[in-house]
Structure formats: structure tokens, C-alpha cells
Regions:
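Nucleotidyltransferase catalytic core that binds NTPs
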Residues: 1-101
């Protein structure tokens, strides 16, 4: 998500980490071929345009409700649900900073 869409979804104090920084972290992963920043409320347009082989979402999403699932699976791609890393999130980092002050 773009910085603008993160602000719309999470509030005016977000994001903490810029879209460029988030993109750099993702692009550094060897399993990532391409990073796209989007401002729409959901990624369907980007998924349709890029036609990824793999779409990954966290397990907090119902697999049937993953946006773009049909697009990816229709061309033989995979949709994966992976658990979030416990204890690591922007919300947790913000709370730690608040309690440290």
C-alpha cells in the first residue's frame, strides 16, 4: 500500500515506515521479483495487471476472501496463507515507544 492508502486505512499518524523503505525491504528478499506500490483500496487492479505466480497473505485473512485469488489461480498460480511473526508489528513498536517515554 502507498503511504496515502496506509494513512486512510490506519490513521493520520501512519505509516511509520515509508512506502519506499517498505518496498526496499521486500525487494531485498530473494523470493521477490517485483514490488508494486498501490493507492487503491484493494490490490485487484495490480494483481490483474501483474499476473503473479504466487500471492501471499497472512492467515488472518479467510482464504476465500483473499482479493485476487481467482486471478492468480485461474492461470495456475498459488495463493499462500502464512502466519504473521508474533510480536513484530508497527502497532507493537509504537506501543513500546510510548511506554518507554
Amino acid at each position: 500500500n502507498s503511504d496515502i492508502s496506509v494513512s486512510q486505512l490506519k490513521g493520520p499518524q501512519r505509516p511509520i515506515v515509508s512506502e519506499n523503505q517498505r518496498g526496499e525491504v521486500l525487494a531485498a528478499l530473494t523470493c521477490v521479483d517485483y514490488v508494486v506500490v498501490f493507492s487503491e483500496p484493494d490490490p485487484l487492479r495490480v494483481i490483474t495487471a501483474v499476473q503473479p505466480d504466487v500471492l501471499v497473505k497472512s492467515t488472518d485473512w479467510d482464504p476465500k476472501e483473499i482479493i485476487g485469488r481467482e486471478v492468480v489461480e485461474a492461470r495456475g498460480g498459488s495463493v499462500l496463507s502464512v502466519p504473521e511473526v508474533t510480536g513484530i508489528s508497527t502497532t507493537i513498536l509504537i506501543e513500546r515507544m510510548r511506554t518507554a517515554l
